[in-house]
């Protein structure tokens, strides 16, 4: 199966503290890929290396090989804006911009110089439909996105990412701040995206990982313990540490 992102021997240091200890992990094109492990294990830190979000943190040193479709993600000449369009990010806390739903979804398109209202209108409708929120907001696109519920705000943020045509969507615990109904809506929406996008999701919710992901990778203390098809990880893991974590012995 074709790999869209490959990482090899990844080390990351916060000052002198080593947070990632030689991670080698690849992601096949399309599907949902879960990163699991206890708090502080390095899964979110690793996720943020994939579109260079850790560049914003002072005193961070990153080593290893990172490739997106055989392009070096850490090439000095790479256009970070373009990279983050292709590898979008959805955060734990919904973070819509403080303006209308319409302007939130079209923000990236406008920044790219697209001004044709017909194109913008089409992108708004398509992206909101993909994010499973069109029916809830279609008659109120001028409403301030901050006035929406947390679950709706998160889906607006996902629509904003989708509008700029990413190939990979990184999701850092996208439902942990949401109620069960909102969580279910986002899970259902992600399942509809899996055939067209590569979704890489950090989650503390074991049931969520087992329900919707195709592959699962288990992190512990900055190490990658194992990675495999989700069914294999949950039913017959190779490593005792994985079995112990999934059975609730620690974490």
UniProtKB/Swiss-Prot annotation:
Gene3D superfamilies, per database record: P-loop containing nucleotide triphosphate hydrolases
Residues engaged in binding ATP: 37-44
Group of enzyme by EC: translocase
PROSITE patterns listed in its UniProt record: ABC_TRANSPORTER_1 (PS00211), ABC_TRANSPORTER_2 (PS50893), PSTB (PS51238)
Highest taxon listed in the record's lineage: Bacteria
Places the protein is found: Cell membrane
Alphabetically ordered keywords of this record: ATP-binding, Cell membrane, Membrane, Nucleotide-binding, Phosphate transport, Translocase, Transport
SUPFAM superfamilies, per database record: P-loop containing nucleoside triphosphate hydrolases (SSF52540)
Membrane topology: Peripheral membrane protein
CDD domains: ABC_PstB_phosphate_transporter
EC number in record: 7.3.2.1
Name listed for the protein in its UniProt record: Phosphate import ATP-binding protein PstB 2
Origin species: Ligilactobacillus salivarius (strain UCC118)
């Amino acid at each position: 199966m074709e790999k869209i992102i490959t990482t090899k021997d990844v080390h990351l240091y916060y000052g002198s503290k080593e947070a990632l200890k030689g991670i080698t992990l690849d992601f096949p094109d399309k599907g949902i890929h879960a990163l699991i492990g206890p708090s502080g294990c390095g899964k979110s830190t690793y996720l943020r290396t994939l579109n260079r979000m850790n560049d914003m943190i002072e005193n961070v040193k990153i080593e290893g090989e990172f490739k997106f479709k055989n392009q070096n993600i850490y090439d000095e000449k790479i256009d970070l804006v373009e990279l983050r369009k292709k590898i979008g990010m959805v955060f734990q806390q919904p973070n819509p911009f403080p303006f209308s739903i319409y302007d939130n979804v079209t923000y990236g398109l406008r920044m790219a110089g697209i001004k044709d209202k017909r194109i913008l209108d089409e992108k708004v409708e398509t992206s909101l439909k993909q994010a499973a929120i069109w029916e809830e907001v279609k008659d109120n696109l001028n409403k301030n996105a901050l006035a929406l519920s947390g679950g709706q705000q998160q889906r607006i943020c996902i629509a904003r990412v989708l509008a700029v045509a990413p190939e990979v969507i990184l999701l850092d615990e996208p439902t942990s701040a949401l109620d069960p109904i909102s969580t279910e809506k986002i899970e259902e929406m992600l399942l509809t995206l899996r055939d067209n996008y590569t979704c890489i999701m950090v989650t503390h919710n074991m049931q969520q990982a087992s329900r919707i992901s195709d592959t699962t990778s288990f992190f512990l203390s900055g190490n990658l313990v194992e990675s495999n098809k989700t069914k294999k990880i949950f039913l017959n893991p190779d490593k005792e540490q994985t079995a112990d974590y999934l059975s609730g012995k620690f974490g």
